[in-house]
Amino acid sequence: MNRYAETHYKFRLPWSPLHRRLPEMIVDAPWMAAPGREVPLFLCVHDAHHFPVTLRAVRVVVRAGGEMHKTEMTFDLRLDNPFHWIDLPWPGPKTVGENLVDVLFEIEDGKGRRRKFVNHNLPTLAPQSLSVLRMSAALAFPSGWTSGDLHCHTSWSEDPVEWGGDPDVMRRAADCQNLGFWAATDHSYDFAWEHPDWLVPTDPVKRFRAFRDSLPKDEPGRSVVLPAEEVSCGNRDGRNVHLLVIDHPEYLPGQGDGGRRGLRNKPDLSIGQVLAETSRSGAPAFAAHPKPGIGLVQRLLFRRGDWDHADLLPHLHGLQFWNGKIGDDFRHGRALWVADLLRGNRRLPIAGNDAHGDLNRATQVSRPLFQLRQTRRHRFGHARTWIYLDSEPTRTSIRTALAGDTATILSDGPFLSLRVGGATTAQERSSSGIELRATSPAEFGNIRAVRVYAHIKGREKEDLLLNATPDAQDWSHRMDLPSGALYLRAETETSKGHRALTRAVEPR
């Protein structure tokens, strides 16, 4: 599980090695910064209403380009709210390349005892430096393309094991990365419980409306924030799976795997029932991490399952099989999407990261009650969904694009263009045949592989039309369109392990 980790909950046990009578305190900053952008740096504080402390001093050290810059500040700041997000200064210039950041902060508890920590105060974790990549140039996507993170969580997702990021903080991080949009896909089961007392039931309809009203509104030049919901619902076997619903106006109940009802873990609604609701509002709906690799404990305690062909029902717009990292969940989810394409459907692929805040890295509970760990596999804004818009991004234009026939590319860095004669959108249409272009920023390595797949009429599987190994930063290629091609799609990888893939493009 990826998140700002909740360490205080003990499951009614008398003791846990993760429990400290201090608030959780984590230093965070975006993992990447677009050229010339200011990098916001935060001290994120959770549960200080239970464990009040006073922030006394902060020292920030940044190492980049062979130089070290630092700044120090003294405070007399009382921390006693459920959440605090404290801005910290960034010392030194905007040095291109990797910037390593370390923050030493000193606090005083209620008994007057002073303690110092580096980057966080979480038990069992070493204080690793934050790594911020300042890009030398913008990502190489042509004008009109805009990118977003379509699966992430804010502070409205809060429960016994996790808490998410502040929406305004996440928007500043999105602006730093030049994200055009992001979806606050907070858990359906968390809306049914009070804040900050997340074990006290509340009215989920009222809380969901408050959530929608609280999100930052459209503002020129800033990332668009999409109100959304990650709905727990029942698959063909009656097991809990997750469905991303973008900008549906009403709350959709789903507490099956929320962990607060004990063994009463059956889904509240089926996939079909949820899609019936979204079809009425026109809200885009996507299968979330459809092949996550569910362990035995989650299957038993939370009745969790995965998506299969029988679950890909009408009014489902696509599949989010890229969930931050590249692993078996990505490969098996992509295989499910391809199998759906071969059946004649043209659902969109989308990418997200399932970040709960997690601007620089994610904190995980690796062993409940006993051990934490950190990973960079689920960082906010890392795996992106790129869409083409004819106008300035707004909540309405992005919602419309995701629900319709829009040119789409998934990427964690490189650009990949696939153009085919007769395609429905201008961004995917060539004058004749197949046109390819792949480019990668220097920071992400050279293009080392480009593959083109096609479904030829009468065949049960895709054909591999091209398997090129260019080893170049900018590469283009033309080839003939095979007879009987029903769709084509393309993928690319770089020498540093970054990748991009297109949606399925139909020749006409």
Provide a role label for each language-model segment.
Residues 146, 221, 239-241, 281, ...:
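Residues that flank catalytic or metal-binding motifs in active/ligand-binding sites
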Residues 153-155, 303, 464:
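Compositionally biased, intrinsically disordered low-complexity segments enriched
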Residues 214-219, 309-312, 376-379:
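Short, conserved catalytic or adaptor-binding loops enriched in Gly and charged residues
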Residues 1-140, 144, 157, 344-348, ...:
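C-terminal functional module detector
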Residues 200, 304, 424-428:
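Alpha-helix boundary/capping detector
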Residues 126-127, 133-288, 295-296, 320-336, ...:
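A metal-dependent hydrolase metal-coordination microenvironment
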Residues 157, 262-374, 443-459, 486:
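Domain-core and long-helix interface of multi-subunit machines
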